Amino acid sequence: MVEKLDRRGFIMVSLGAVVLLDSQFLSCGGKNDMTAFLYSDIYLRHLTGDGHPEKPERLTSIYNRLNQSEWYGDLTLIRPESANLDVISLVHSHDYIETVRKECEAGYTSLSTGDTVICGESYAVALEAAGGVCSAVDAVFEEKAKNAFCAVRPPGHHATPDRGMGFCVFNNVAIAARYAQRKYNAERVLIADWDVHHGNGTQDTFYTDGSVFFMSTHQSPLYPGTGKIEETGAGDGEGATMNRPFPAGAGNSEIIGAFRDDLLPAARAFRPDFTLISAGFDSRVDDPLGSFEVDDDGFRELTEIMLEIAHVSGGGRLVSVLEGGYNIEGIARAAEAHVDELFKA
């Protein structure tokens, strides 16, 4: 049932997804050199309760701000599609996937595996989040877009292969990396995480795998307590993990410096075919869950560095996936700065 038209005249359905008929992509500008944007009201159905910081308003704030940007009409919009279990199983164990499904259906209010609030629709929404990010991967590899930003929830970087924690259900960025490797034969994938919290789930997924380079800047000490500088990978993955923990108060100089001086040379040596960002905007100066002081200009410069990395050997293919960020106005401003740089690339 059609409810309304958005300001560009695209038909919106009750779930908030753009009607795209036979295509999962809709290009406003009709070119393949545009930035893709993934958002749907489906992601608002993961309900966390009053007072919880990981709330639906995080996404609506981003959408409303981007929708007022002068370049919004030139973005390529992506319709989310639910990930099938084969895709989720690229990262997560069958037992864990079943735990999430059964506990959501049974009316649990939080996952038994960790501190992640759930509701009856959380399993379905998490499948849509992971599937939407995979649709963004399709967009850049099939040259429907040059890069993409995915405003999804629940977030994912704390989810390990067999455990949900830290507000996360399925690890969207890890699934996207494995999906790119399986479907598009990406031999080397680089993931950079600038969330204020360490991406322990992503690190765990690839710790012994040299085909995925993972780098994280994060506040320490802070939840989840992982990500020491000495954690550099093991076995075949030795040297493919890079952690740069910083104390409270770190800002543009420290975080940008780690990306420019440490990650960029490593990326040139690694030569990724595909680049992913875990874009956590809780490293912003005003976030209630962290004590970093990165500002919007800082996120612009971080984005520029990541775009440079994406062009090292991957033809610019880059997908950015929302993680944290809990100041409702701050997350929108940071996301706008980030997407503006993606768009200008």
Language model: regions and residue ranges:
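HDAC/HDAC-like amidohydrolase catalytic core signature
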Residues: 2-345
